[in-house]
Amino acid sequence: MKFTPIKTLAAIALLCALSSTAYAAKIGDTEFTYGGYIKLDAMWSDYSAGAPAGTSVGRDFYVPSTLTVGNDNSSDAVFDMHARESRFNFGTATLLDNGKTVKTKIELDFLLSAPGGNERVSNSYSPRIRHAFISYDGWLFGQTWSNFQNVGALPEALDFVGPAEGTVFVRQSQIKYTTGAWSFSLENPESTITTAGGGMAVTDDASLPDFTARYTHNADWGNFVVTALARQLTYKVGGVDADETSFGVSASGMVKLGEDNLKFMLTQGKGLGRYVGLNVARGAVLNGDDLDAIDSTSGFIAYQHKWNSQWRSTFLYSFLSADNDENLLAMYGDPTESSQSYSANILYSPVKRLTFGAEFKHAERELESGVDGDMDRLQFSVKYAF
């Protein structure tokens, strides 16, 4: 199919004209879709060991590694409000001459954007890419959720992630092939390594992509997903050339309980690092000229109850435990040993696309030395999906 500038402009004009009542338009053999949501988050957070800096991402949503630890007498409460989770996406689906369909999607939001925004005058923030991919005949090329992650297992929460320390959570460039219940991918590699003194090195020196495999079972009662990951951790700095093989497996799913549902995930691995817990535990420790991968176990369980057609609640528990080598503590400092959180919310949708909600979250983080800290957060949100 050939696209002329006139047809392209016509498609854009039609989408704009329909934006208040519809979110798809078809020009020739191509269907254009547009969607997203606007969301306001207002949060009151009380930290036992003092609040993170105002520029910390942990002030926008719960990130376990940013939870402060230390003196309980440093309790500090802060209030934050933003609309940075708001997002929009644009997609196409084109029927080709061979009878197959090629699809594209791009989605952006405003979280974690580069410096440039501020809260003094304009509160302006740059957009960032969440998804940008092409799919054709079982293949996917581009950036989207890792094949190692089951996005469908994430519970409904007001916090951006929800079970932050307990879930696999990665978006990255990849080549993925899906056939039936199976999917396999080659994904962008990256390593987070603890160096002497507790510093962190983020390296991109792997000679091989990360490899994942996934099996999905769907049934009337819900679904069950098993995923596996194999990757190469590397550190090539200052004359050191070290690498280590890392493995992990994750099981997750959703069980229907009438109108309610139960969602869960359990992940175990060696050197998982950035793949779980928003990188609260690193992938490996530099031990001389070698890398020692860090074992970790993480997971969550969430129950959602529908009070009626407009009101619902999610009750969530999430955890991560890292098995740090105690013999190396003197060299790489005092890393995170465990992180956990629990939350409960109440959500009200007077109409399908509009949601008002309140959520309470309690989170804890403990270092290997026993030093710890906690946070209590009360969050109010309003969201309209379009």
Predicted feature descriptions by range:
Residues 348-350, 354, 374-386:
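Outer-membrane beta-barrel "beta-signal"
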